[in-house]
Amino acid sequence: MLKKVATTLLVVAIPIAISLAIFQKTTIQTNTPISVAVLQPNVDPYTEKYNQKNEESLAVVQQMMAPYNMNSIDLVIAPETYFAEGAGLSLRNFETSTLYKSIDDWLSNYPKTQFVTGIQLFKTYTSEDTKTATSNLIREQLWVDFYNSAFIHPSFDENTIYHKSKLVVGVENTPYRSIIEPILGNVLLDLGGTVFTKATQEYRTSFPLIKGASIAPIICYESVYGSFVTDYVRAGATILVIMTNDAWWSNTQGHKQHLSYAKLRA
């Protein structure tokens, strides 16, 4: 009996001891430090968030950054779905939108600074032939894909937008949709859009920074999945950025658990 206990303890203790030894000898060096501003605008998601216009949300960001020297900051980070006016902005026309132009005008004063933020986007389809499996039927001959996305500006390659791809079941994703929708039909539309399925993307994306590093735009629930986060690193990410809507959790342990996951992933 004692032999079995001793063997079990050794099996557990030896890897821990090796890990601690490696940790003590490991030094993390960087020749190019990144200066980051992480914003928490503290917008109540239950009473304010979705009634606030995008231009007002941008003004809050600018006001929060006003006391700081933007020329010394490499990256400004805003929360998940921070720009969430209405149903979102059209993905097809995003770069010609008023919000995009306003962000571009703001950052043109700070050529060394990049801005990454959460945003709601959508894409419409008017034909059975072009609609996707994730698109939501809004009315006759109109289907819409909704995205919980991350956006970086300015960007220096084709990767400017990433769509959240690990969705919260029941909030962003309807399970067994092919079975449930024919049964409930338009009842789904009467729930305020809360059960609209979000669209995703197949591969992880990293956003390159001016200083040569690359960030993983991890959105909320995605951080729970270790191997999923690893895919960001395989895509070239060297910095993990986790954007969340922690205010949804109110005064619970949820936001603290999110922080613990973030430290674990790092």
Give the ranges of each region predicted by the language model.
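Membrane-interfacial entry segments at the cytosolic side of transmembrane helices
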Residues: L2-L10
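Solvent-exposed soluble domains appended to multi-pass membrane proteins
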Residues: A78-A266
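Membrane-interface segments at or immediately adjacent to transmembrane helices
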Residues: V11-K112
